[in-house]
């Protein structure tokens, strides 16, 4: 199949001759003629610069990006995998349309989504990154195939406008090659180019039920509520629908919210809960039955501010009573295997670690009454000996912590202790956020290449890390406090802490209700970002690595692929060191490593 470019005939601008008179003495007729010539020339230039081209999902097209040459789409995907690609158009103010031709395969047409890639304006670059102010592509605002759209429009710069085409391959799809044609009309009313882009999708003969990497992304219900119209009643069925769509979107991206946002009624004094009503409200999100969201990982509602406020000092018996009832409910509902307790954050002082010890032992005592051990997550690092300063030995926690969640920049100085804890059956997660080492570490900031989001899955497989925690997902509040309202479409600066400035590290999605961009449904799911799509791609690519390792010779194949991605590895030692691995900046290298794994896995499957 070859792409076809059709242009309506354009009338050439008329020739002009040099005028013998000086400009100051132009006649009215001459001035009119000159104006007409200029207008026609500008129109001709606009048409000449108009273009349609294709770039990979992980690339970035800026407002000033020049047209490329590629006009074909060639994707491949496993069962239950999502794959994206960007189609860019360039030109002045006009209407464009993307649609499927009638000969396109239903698998592609029925499972494809279209988004326009909008730009956000970074005015304060992320600290220590070395990036520049300017317009960055990020939010993926949903659009409909077949609908005409005005671009660039008054709310975003141009002349280049990217669109994001995302295809999902349902698990169980027959392997093979599927084709379609994506028709791009670059100026619907003005006679611009019409490009038929050949679209090829290869479906591999393997797949997965869900992403196996564990996760916890802090979703703010307060910020979500502030993003909705003032007259919207965020309660009852309205609230349930908003949360269902939000959590479903997260599930589709292979990640989980920390807490499901319904809390039980609790007696402050005794810790007794009002059972039943709360559990019935969260069941549609936590259950694995048909029609339920099936959130993969969940934080049991035992928080610094719930069921007791920070100023209260509940007795151990009250805490034990509450946790006994809650862990029993989780066991009876079948949620206990996905649940964890996470009540303290970054316990750097000995007194804080002793408090964690107390909470963990109460939680384990409570869950033991229901015949299991609920996992206790702590954002701390295991230390068999003192490392100086506040980093004293904490082996007294070894039997209490089930999920050690290490800050990424500490991890590479804790590997010996981490491996010892893994041999003892403990989970290891990474805790990521932006700091002064942002240039060296993977980060979710907007003004850094999307490789950073994609590499997480590969890095986690390389270092045998079970999960990832990020302390913000929709932090649409003030960058200093998180309170109030910040429009992330217009102000991407999501965090100010001391001298640190960060764009988007705690804001991976955008409000799904945003009439300015044509999003007028309050219950809609949040808007994804190029960064979040790349995170999912990396987590899906980790599934390739894990599947390959289960096959004869697959361990070697996985190791070879990882070496192409991770270009240097720091020395292993237990010390306060901050040496980090390096990784390729080439998306083509990622793509080649992924495809090599896919071809190996497919060849090993029974015919």
Please provide the spans of the model-predicted regions.
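Short, solvent-exposed loop/turn segments enriched in Ser/Thr/Gly
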Residues: 69, 80-86, 161-162, 173-181
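Catalytic domains of carbohydrate-active enzymes that cleave complex glycans
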Residues: 305-311, 319-356, 360-393, 481-607
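Active-site clefts of carbohydrate-active enzymes
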Residues: 423-454, 473-475
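Glycoside hydrolase catalytic-domain groove-lining segments
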Residues: 394-405, 409-437
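Bacterial N-terminal signal peptides
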Residues: 30-44, 49
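Short solvent-exposed strand-capping/beta-turn motif centered on an Asx-Ser/Thr pair
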Residues: 78-80, 90-94, 103, 172, ...
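Surface-exposed binding patches on compact interaction domains or structured appendages
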Residues: 51-70, 92-165, 174
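Aromatic-lined carbohydrate-binding surfaces of glycoside hydrolases
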Residues: 90, 136, 141, 148, ...
């Amino acid at each position: 199949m070859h792409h076809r470019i059709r242009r309506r005939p354009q009338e050439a601008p008329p020739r002009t001759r040099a005028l013998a008179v000086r400009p100051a003495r132009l006649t009215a007729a001459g001035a009119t003629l000159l104006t007409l010539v200029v207008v026609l020339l500008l129109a001709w230039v606009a048409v000449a610069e108009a273009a349609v081209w294709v770039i990979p999902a992980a690339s970035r097209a800026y407002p000033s990006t020049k047209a490329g040459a590629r006009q074909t789409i060639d994707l491949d995907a496993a069962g239950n995998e999502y794959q994206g690609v960007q189609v860019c158009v360039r030109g002045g103010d006009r209407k464009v349309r993307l649609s499927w031709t009638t000969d396109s395969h239903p698998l592609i047409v029925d499972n494809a989504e279209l988004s326009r890639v909008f730009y956000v304006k970074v005015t304060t670059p992320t600290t220590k990154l070395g990036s520049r102010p300017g317009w960055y592509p990020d939010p993926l605002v949903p659009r409909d195939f077949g609908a005409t759209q005005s671009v660039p429009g008054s709310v975003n710069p141009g002349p280049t406008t990217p669109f994001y085409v995302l295809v999902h391959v349902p698990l169980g799809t027959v392997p093979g090659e599927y084709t379609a044609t994506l028709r791009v009309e670059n100026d619907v009313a003005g006679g611009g180019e019409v490009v038929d882009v050949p679209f090829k999708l290869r479906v591999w003969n393997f797949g997965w039920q869900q992403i196996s990497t564990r996760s916890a992304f802090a979703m703010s219900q307060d910020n979500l509520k502030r993003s909705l119209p003032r007259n919207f009643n965020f309660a009852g069925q309205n609230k349930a629908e908003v949360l269902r769509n939000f959590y479903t979107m997260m599930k589709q991206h292979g990640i989980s919210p920390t807490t499901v946002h319904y809390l039980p009624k609790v007696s402050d004094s005794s810790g007794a809960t009002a059972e039943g009503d709360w559990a019935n409200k969260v069941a549609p999100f936590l259950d694995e039955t048909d029609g339920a969201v099936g959130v993969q990982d969940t934080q049991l509602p035992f928080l610094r501010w719930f069921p007791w406020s920070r100023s209260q000092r509940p007795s151990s018996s009250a805490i034990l009573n509450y946790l006994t009832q809650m862990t029993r409910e989780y066991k009876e509902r079948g949620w206990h295997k996905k649940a964890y307790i996470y009540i303290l954050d970054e316990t750097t002082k000995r007194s804080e670690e002793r408090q964690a010890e107390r909470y963990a032992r109460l939680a384990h005592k409570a869950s033991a009454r229901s015949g299991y051990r609920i996992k206790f997550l702590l954002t701390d690092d295991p230390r068999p000996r003192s490392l100086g300063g506040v980093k004293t030995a904490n082996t007294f926690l070894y039997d209490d912590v089930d999920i050690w969640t290490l800050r990424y920049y500490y991890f590479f100085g804790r590997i010996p202790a981490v491996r010892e804890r893994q041999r003892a059956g403990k989970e290891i997660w990474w805790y990521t956020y932006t700091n002064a080492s942002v240039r060296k570490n993977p980060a979710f900031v907007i003004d850094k290449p999307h490789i950073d989001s994609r590499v997480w899955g590969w890095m986690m497989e390389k270092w045998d890390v079970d999960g990832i925690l990020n302390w913000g997902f929709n932090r649409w509040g003030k960058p200093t406090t998180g309170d109030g309202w910040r429009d992330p479409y217009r102000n991407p600066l999501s965090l100010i802490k001391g001298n640190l400035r960060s764009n988007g590290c705690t804001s991976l999605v955008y409000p799904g209700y945003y009439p300015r961009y044509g999003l007028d449904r309050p219950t809609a799911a949040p808007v994804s970002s190029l960064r979040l799509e790349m995170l999912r791609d990396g987590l899906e690519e980790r599934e390739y690595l894990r599947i390959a390792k289960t096959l004869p010779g697959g361990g070697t194949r996985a190791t070879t692929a990882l070496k192409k991605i991770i270009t240097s590895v720091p020395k292993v030692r237990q010390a306060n060191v901050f040496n980090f691995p390096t990784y390729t900046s080439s998306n083509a290298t990622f793509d080649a490593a992924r495809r090599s794994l896919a071809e190996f896995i497919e060849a090993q499957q029974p015919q």
